[in-house]
């Protein structure tokens, strides 16, 4: 086979004369102890006499004995086609060579002997033979400095040699076959490519079976524009680099791409002549040097071989900082390897690299990724929109305890995220810059899609944390140091996908969404997100952010501009108190016609239309609803029964902020219109006054007291009284404010469920007011004392009903409290499935509960006493459920046996009993209790 040759000179040599292959042999240093140095020992060291050293022989190589120098064109062709065979032949001849077996020729043999003596190990038995002179054809730094198996055995004198007198990465026997070596300055691999050098345990010479290394090694191949070597090595040089991690780790079973040796050698694109500016590694000079490394390797490795494609300087800066700050790369790893980094190092975990910045084959993806202590490290973050502070904050924060803040920020600006242990490792994400494909292995992609904790960590890296000041200008926000996703402000809608399908699709979506003020999305981005964000950022100013329709609406009137008399319906000037409410003439006529005409108005909106002086005619349904809520009833004409002076003073009390002094006889009425600073000012008469005005008149039973009482006559008289009271309940409920807003079916249902409770409650109130609870005052013509109760057939039932007036006497219930409790009894039982107008029903019930509290406050002073009073009254309402159930059962039994008992039941009462009492007794209704039993 032909031998690997270097190309023509790119710069004039330093010898001062034309290069000639016959000048001499270069000074070859003693190779660093190989991985199998212990297998071959030598008891004695060769004695070499002093020889003169030729400078030309030191700097320029020459061909082997008996070999003619080749022309430059032939050398270029052989250098490309024999990359695989060069390293294999060098390994095949190692077992036959020795330190003194080379035939001396001119200065070459003597110089090699001198170097063998100078660079011999210090301990006995550590001498190692060198390969034959003419077999190793590589004049390049193919594998970098070799690490000896025993680091202390490395020669100490090797570090003091001049960089030009030592071969940083060549083998020890490279004395011939390198005629063109003087044309190219020997150089080592860049620090970023040292990560993939073969381990120290891998074979280097022949005689040992070659094993594929877990990571492919990198071979630099020079490419010259217009050279004829493109025909044979075109795919290796012009094509995109390929990751060989999967093939190399497979034990050699997988197919190896062209240009890769059995040991996993991968081709690395050579630097272009247009980019020759070196980049010096300043920190590596102070870092401890790995055992077996030469000073030349440290110097030449600082030159970064820039590819032809345009570079992203931000990513290069981040990568350089990574390589310079990690001293573990050059510190040595003992018998393991100094160039294959341990699993816990950042270099072993952060393998993916963007195409166009570094060759992909130099950073193959890890086939078996594992978590380590460097979570936020690597090249998985896109370098777009980054600055120096962000680079430090996103990468160095995970490697060192230092915290990198935004320029001008202090630690107090990040109170929510104290420095702590690094968050869990996010999986490697594919590069997201436009025009770049994701270069990841299948196992790595699978680990990305199966990781559930990656979303939270990647999210905190890409998005600004809540509480952190936003980055101004076109820069991206600083990374979030929160351990979880809960600490970030923006939602997950715009998060990029980290699944394997997204990696195979190509470019990922933009990782930095457009941000507006304080990190919020722009106005045209997402309205829902903006609204949610404003609630967190601008809570005191949300009232100012109203739609245009609401912004134009102002209060109808203020307290300062309140006229003496205004309409409580539309806000116009009031003409007087009509139907119990201070209204204008227009609303008065509207309410009268609506109630008398029995119109069924329907709102076209949501029953929340605005009713004012201008828009009061737009929606009659909402206008009528507002009239009923204000308390307008047709029975409001009963206000005429009051003294005219008293009514006028009541109206003045509504219009003026301070109550007007009135005579003592109207002190109770004045309390209803007296306002205190802690109470809500109401611009309409209290609801209690309306309840007083609609209270039914006295109803007579029509019982003939001249005849002796019989069971049938007494029960028949009570049924006739019940019929009349039922009609009175229907009329009263229709005049009740808010009751007409319910569905007509709900109105009927409530009356049928509560008519018995209302009648027995009214019985107790009349007994309490007229006879102080000593008798049962059914009607003025039907009053049962205890003697008549005993003579009746329902004495036990009379004793049950007698408990109510006795409770009234005990609690001294006022009329206002009784009226509010009576309304609550109407709203105290509903069907199990609920009402059709359930929402309106609950609002109505809540309003009357508040009225009961106000009625209690008229007499009780203090919060404690008012609370106790409210508990006592509501407890009485709850106890009525059990009492009324006994009445229902007796009434149903009497109705069933009416013919046998000769008891008459009126028509309406019969319908209600037959339709509803079986359901009530069967438990098909839901009683609304204030307290749990």
From Swiss-Prot:
Region feature (Disordered): 1-256, 332-380, 415-454
Span of the annotated motif LXXL motif 2: 115-119
One protein family per Pfam: Hormone_recep
PTMs per UniProt: Phosphorylated on multiple serine sites. Several of these sites are hormone-dependent. Phosphorylation on Ser-294 is highly hormone-dependent and modulates ubiquitination and sumoylation on Lys-388. Phosphorylation on Ser-345 also requires induction by hormone. Basal phosphorylation on Ser-162, Ser-190 and Ser-400 is increased in response to progesterone and can be phosphorylated in vitro by the CDK2-A1 complex. Increased levels of phosphorylation on Ser-400 also in the presence of EGF, heregulin, IGF, PMA and FBS.
Annotated ranges, domain NR LBD: 679-913
AF1: annotated span: 456-546
Residues spanned by motif LXXL motif 1: 55-59
Major subcellular location class: nucleus
Residues that bear Phosphoserine: 20, 130, 162, 190, 213, 294, 345, 400, 676
Region (AF3): 1-164
Residues annotated for progesterone binding in this entry: 766
Start-end of NR C4-type zinc fingers: 567-587, 603-627
Top-level lineage group: Eukaryota
Subcellular compartments: Nucleus; Cytoplasm
One GO CC annotation: cytoplasm
Skewed-composition ranges (Pro residues): 418-433
Biased composition (Acidic residues): 220-231
Xref: SMART domains: HOLI, ZnF_C4
An annotated Gene Ontology molecular function: sequence-specific DNA binding
Biased composition regions of type Low complexity, renumbered to the chain: 335-350, 434-454
Region described as Mediates transcriptional transrepression: 165-305
Region Modulating, Pro-Rich: start-end pairs: 1-566
Entry note about domains: Composed of three domains: a modulating N-terminal domain, a DNA-binding domain and a C-terminal ligand-binding domain.
Subunit structure: Interacts with SMARD1 and UNC45A. Interacts with CUEDC2; the interaction promotes ubiquitination, decreases sumoylation, and represses transcriptional activity. Interacts with PIAS3; the interaction promotes sumoylation of PR in a hormone-dependent manner, inhibits DNA-binding, and alters nuclear export. Interacts with SP1; the interaction requires ligand-induced phosphorylation on Ser-345 by ERK1/2-MAPK. Interacts with PRMT2. Interacts with NCOA2 and NCOA1. Interacts with KLF9. Interacts with GTF2B.
Similarity annotation: Belongs to the nuclear hormone receptor family.
The protein's name: Progesterone receptor
Protein species of origin: Chlorocebus aethiops (Green monkey)
